[in-house]
């Protein structure tokens, strides 16, 4: 499935990992991007 940002646009991060945090946690949630070294 395609994940969308807050503007409704597809999230693009070059094939790295991302984590979705719930809004009730921390500073309001968000995404964390990380490269894995195994992108294709």
Swiss-Prot record:
EC number(s)?
3.4.21.4
State the temperature dependence of activity: Stable at temperatures up to 70 degrees Celsius. Incubation at temperatures above 70 degrees Celsius steadily decreases inhibitory activity.
Q: Keyword annotations for this protein? A: Hydrolase, Protease inhibitor, Serine protease inhibitor
Description of pH dependence: Stable in the pH range 2.2-10.0.
Molecular function in Gene Ontology: serine-type endopeptidase activity; serine-type endopeptidase inhibitor activity
Reaction(s) this enzyme catalyzes, per UniProt: Preferential cleavage: Arg-|-Xaa, Lys-|-Xaa
Specify the enzyme's EC class, one word: hydrolase
Q: What does this protein do?
A: Inhibits trypsin but not chymotrypsin, papain or porcine pancreatic alpha-amylase. Has insecticidal activity against A.aegypti. Functions by inhibiting the A.aegypti midgut proteases to reduce the survival of larva and adults.
Assembly and binders: Monomer.
Family of the protein in this entry: Belongs to the protease inhibitor I3 (leguminous Kunitz-type inhibitor) family.
Q: What is this protein called?
A: Trypsin inhibitor
């Amino acid at each position: 499935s395609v994940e969308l940002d807050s503007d409704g646009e597809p999230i693009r991060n070059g094939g790295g990992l991302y984590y979705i945090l719930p809004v009730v946690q921390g500073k309001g949630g968000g995404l964390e991007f990380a490269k894995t070294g195994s992108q294709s």
